[in-house]
Amino acid sequence: QDVEAGAVSFRKCAPCHAVGEGAANKVGPVLNGLPGRKSGTIAGFNYSDANKNSGITWDKATFKTYITDPRAKIPGTKMVFAGIKNDKEQDDLWAYLSQFGPDGKKK
């Protein structure tokens, strides 16, 4: 995985999501601490019932399925994004996001 390529890919996500120290919820929730986090648990973000009740714990495989087609993975999600179909881009994006701990600091 290429973290720098993942950072470039994250530009597609940045209009709605934030990562890093001082990140705040936007249209979408903060993505700090994503690996191992339960879906629908970021404080202060108004998740859809579908997201809160999905039972998802984020790992690479789940993320890749979700980011391929968010509305297919979680019908009823508020996320309005067509998805990322390219396998390498998905891997790079996961590598980029995975480096941020829950506090937004890089591991």
From Swiss-Prot:
Keywords, alphabetical: Electron transport, Heme, Iron, Metal-binding, Periplasm, Photosynthesis, Pyrrolidone carboxylic acid, Transport
Pyrrolidone carboxylic acid modification, residue list: 1
Pfam families tied to this protein: Cytochrom_C
Domain of life, per lineage: Bacteria
List of residues binding heme c: 13, 16-17, 79
UniProt PTM: Binds 1 heme c group covalently per subunit.
A GO term from the CC aspect: periplasmic space
Gene3D superfamilies, per database record: Cytochrome c-like domain
Entry function: Cytochrome c2 is found mainly in purple, non-sulfur, photosynthetic bacteria where it functions as the electron donor to the oxidized bacteriochlorophyll in the photophosphorylation pathway. However, it may also have a role in the respiratory chain and is found in some non-photosynthetic bacteria.
Name of protein: Cytochrome c2
Provenance organism: Rhodoplanes tepidamans (Rhodoplanes cryptolactis)
